[in-house]
Regions:
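N-terminal topogenic membrane-targeting module
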Residues: 5-65
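Charge-rich, solvent-exposed alpha-helical interaction surfaces
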Residues: 22, 26-29, 33, 90-94, ...
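Low-complexity, intrinsically disordered regions enriched in charged/polar residues
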Residues: 17-20, 24-28, 85, 119, ...
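Glycine-rich, aromatic-bearing surface loops/beta-hairpins
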Residues: 113-136
Length: 136
């Protein structure tokens, strides 16, 4: 890490880590997402799905869910459910709070399609994001 660099160097995610298999399950949709956004990605894997923080959480970011080979952004899901901008903003604040509460979670990096992606195998963060998504 350079003197002026804000990028954190996380250890590489080993193939023996269960999170590596979880990321592999969503690798193709993750690659598809990478062609649509140029922002950094942080994957929070779980069994059968993953959440992706897009951008630079906890400041400026978006959230997407990868499940059954599909990527759906939080904003798109919220609009489908008819939520207004005020409610969406409140839920975004909850995502920020959940992320900040889990800042100490172990993070790793993995190479996907030639790009470095951060992986955060944190069950607590998955549970909190699930609660927020289910509250829509």
């Amino acid at each position: 890490m350079g003197f002026f660099s804000k990028k954190v160097n996380y250890p590489e995610l080993g193939a023996d880590n269960p999170a590596a298999g979880q990321v592999q399950e969503v690798e193709q949709p993750l690659k598809d997402l990478m062609t649509q956004v140029s922002d950094p990605l942080e994957v929070i894997p779980s069994d059968g799905y993953a959440y992706v923080f897009i951008g630079k959480p906890p400041k400026k970011f978006g959230v997407a869910k990868i499940e059954e080979g599909q990527v759906q952004s939080f904003v798109a899901a919220a609009r489908e459910k008819g939520l207004d901008q005020v409610k969406i903003q409140k839920l975004n604040e909850k995502f920020r709070d959940a992320y900040e509460q889990n800042m100490d979670a172990q993070r790793y990096t993995i190479n996907v399609a030639g790009k470095e992606v951060v992986v955060t195998p944190c069950k607590e963060l998955v549970q909190e994001v699930n609660q927020i998504m289910n509250s829509m």
